[in-house]
């Protein structure tokens, strides 16, 4: 069985405005960090790389809701020291249009930074540029 060639496309987190930090402004309802978009290049999965900055003078807990809110299945709980910047996710995958959300033990003091590497199928006719009903193929990648 042959598998289609895949490529990585680096993307801004969907919860970020132009790559800026995402402020975790909630202690109960998850703030969107990233949502996997299976329609983007028939994306197989996204690999996330996330850092957190705690601007408070006290240690804070960051909880990442990874595709759901069931404990412990979908929760990643991290303690972040006061005034520290810490890598909190190093290449964990998400797929199937699931999302990653965050809550913190105090609102408006923890910021999330990062990016997603989307693993996508390369279009077989990568040398041509053409349009279809739903997608435009450019240099082998579907652009929306």
Task: List the predicted regions and their residue ranges.
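Exposed aromatic-hydrophobic patches
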Residues: 85-91
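Short, surface-exposed beta-strand/strand-loop-strand elements in extracellular ectodomains
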Residues: 55-77
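Short beta-strand/loop motifs in extracellular/secreted proteins, especially
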Residues: 46-48, 58-62, 108-112
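C-terminal interaction-tip segments
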Residues: 1-43, 104-144
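Short proline/glycine- and polar residue-rich coil/turn motifs
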Residues: 78-85
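Short, solvent-exposed loop/turn segments enriched in Ser/Thr/Gly
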Residues: 40-49, 93-95
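Buried hydrophobic-core signal for structured, non-transmembrane domains
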Residues: 48-53, 100-102
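Noncatalytic modules at the cell exterior or secretory-pathway interfaces
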Residues: 92-109
